[in-house]
Design a protein with these regions (language model features):
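OB-fold nucleic-acid-binding modules
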Residues: 1-15
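Divalent metal-coordination and catalytic microenvironments
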Residues: 19, 66, 169, 278
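OB-fold single-stranded nucleic acid-binding module
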Residues: 24-34, 46-50, 54-102
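Short, acidic/hydrophobic/Gly-rich beta-strand patch recurrent on exposed beta strands
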Residues: 37-42, 204
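Acidic/His-rich, divalent-metal-binding segments that scaffold phosphate/diphosphate chemistry
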Residues: 97-216, 257
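Divalent metal-dependent catalytic cores for phosphoryl transfer on phosphate-bearing substrates
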Residues: 153-155, 164, 174-294
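Acidic, carboxylate-rich catalytic segments that either coordinate divalent cations
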Residues: 267-327
């Protein structure tokens, strides 16, 4: 199936395309002025529909989040934001379209697995290698880890996003640990395991969403429980209790502060490094996503036309110079 790049659509362009219905919202503007707006998704991104007003809302009465629909429409613009003016929409049967073609993805994950497994094999301590093997030598775990997004929306919100994110965190963290004379192998373990709770926190078979337990407990707590459960299932114990506590602490503290979701604040050098490496990967990915999306800019402008939510109320700047380098 041909994938239209939603970030490069021109006003007036007509589309006939299968989309994943990412969201359905009813918006009220006072009195009886209600409208329905669909958010449609494919592997390249998302676009909102033009509002369906009044009786016209019946056209999308059977459309719900997570369905796949065949859409015919024309790209329009309202207040500087592109939207799809839908002339026809119908729900497609399950299985007619491969969902992987409608979801954002990191693409080929081989490069991330190659680096991750190379780092694991170089870990000096046999007990630490054993702990990591409890997870990454498990084929079911690897299959889930390879697919899971790092977030439903936000940084690395794509199939394989978690694998890409932890690879970045490990690369950043190991370098800082080397400079700071920290334990590189322990840092690696924390980087690879800090977000394992997201496997139980999110669903990704269609729209990326939180599970019930994900909303109730959060990925930090779920990750801690998963880690404890795996170690208890292993006989004899793969490592000393004190060693396990160091990794548990990194899982529980990687958000840095309680108000940002940490169960405790970092108390070890490796936990402190992990927190900032995690943040660096997330923030850099968010900035790159904003700057790569032409819908955030007016024409050839270098500064974003708005303050994207990913940048916490800041604008972005995409200007680049060659510094005299000859191409």
């Amino acid at each position: 199936m041909t994938i239209h790049n939603l970030k490069q659509l021109a006003v007036g362009e007509r589309l006939q395309h299968a989309f994943l219905v990412w969201d359905v919202q009813t918006r009220s503007y006072g009195g009886d002025k209600d409208c329905t707006v669909l958010t449609l998704s494919n592997a390249s991104g998302r676009i909102e529909s033009a509002p369906f007003w009044g009786a016209d809302q019946q056209r999308v009465a059977g459309i719900s989040k997570g369905l796949v629909a065949q859409v015919i429409g024309e790209v329009g613009e309202f207040r500087g934001k592109r939207q799809l003016c839908i002339s026809s929409i119908r729900v497609l049967p399950d299985g007619q379209v491969d969902l992987s073609e409608l979801l954002p993805s990191v693409g080929n994950t081989e490069q991330y697995w190659r680096k991750l497994d190379e780092w694991r094999q170089a870990v000096a301590g046999p007990r630490l290698r054993k702990v990591l093997g409890l997870f990454f030598d498990d084929d079911d775990f690897r299959r889930q880890f390879e697919q899971c997004p790092a977030s439903p929306v936000g940084h690395h919100a794509e199939l394989g996003g978690l694998l890409k994110h932890v690879t970045e965190v490990a690369a950043i963290g190991r370098m800082i640990a080397r400079i700071s004379k920290g334990d590189e192998d322990l840092l690696l373990a924390g980087a690879l395991l800090h977000d394992i709770g997201k496997l139980e926190c999110y669903t990704w078979n269609g729209v990326f969403e939180y599970t019930d337990v994900g909303r109730l407990c959060g990925h930090v707590v779920l990750g801690s429980l998963m880690f404890d459960r795996r170690l208890r299932e292993c006989t004899p114990a793969p490592c000393l209790d004190g060693e396990a506590n160091l990794i548990q602490h990194m899982i529980l503290s990687h958000h840095g502060k309680e108000e940002f979701g940490a169960a405790v604040r970092p108390m070890t050098l490796e936990a402190e490094i992990l927190h900032y490496a995690d943040n660096a990967s997330a923030k850099a990915a968010s900035m790159a996503e904003v700057l790569d999306d032409p819908t955030n800019f007016n024409a050839e402008a270098l500064v974003t036309s708005k303050k994207p939510w990913q940048l916490d109320g800041r604008r972005g700047y995409r200007g680049r110079f060659d510094w005299g380098v000859e191409s």
